[in-house]
């Protein structure tokens, strides 16, 4: 009896809402679907992307900072490290990731080695340049105050080099965020995973959403670094106001 009633009324089509209708039509960007699926589909990828970027930047900064200090003290060390890091930087990203797979396997290790390698040249150059551009007057004043070479480095030279160092961190951060997206070509991690998946399936919303999230992540990171820079270098603002 119930079957007869439903047959007379015609087929029953569930109401999926505007988001699902947009997805069925493969709209360019379905906002409702994105908001409904952000927590499950995209937020874990955002966290992975942040982790990939943060780990690479932390390791790259430690290596580059130490190398810059050595090169600042022993100038003959500058050229070999600069050439090595420049060699890493010139390797195409996808090729670098593929080269690492037979060596360290598919996963975080291969991606992090490649990402760290791309940060070295930028961070090393900016740190060393910042130290080399410290005015001689500042060094002489520190020496006149009785500071040792190590004390002068920590209290005078490094603080004056902070703007150049952070400028390098800004560039390295944005670069790493973009390269971490390409890393999903090797293994599905970060925001590159939904991007490459959407390319294969033709899912417009997933592609646009993941791309916009990667762009937003880079912009937010850049703003945060600028705020940190201003907090660490108040004398730069005071100097610009005086000028």
What are these regions (language model features)?
Residues 75, 132, 209-243:
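C-terminal transmembrane helix and the adjacent membrane-cytosol boundary/short C-terminal tail
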Residues 8-56:
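Periplasmic/extracellular loop-to-transmembrane helix junction in inner-membrane transport proteins
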Residues 39-51, 82-88, 101, 105, ...:
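Alpha-helical membrane-interface segments at transmembrane helix boundaries
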Residues 41-52, 101-122, 206, 210:
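Loop-to-helix entry region at the N-terminal start of transmembrane alpha-helices
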Residues 67-100, 125-132:
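Cytoplasmic-entry segments and transmembrane alpha-helices of multi-pass inner-membrane transporters
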Residues 126-165, 171, 195:
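Short cytoplasmic-facing helical segments at TM-TM junctions of multi-pass membrane proteins
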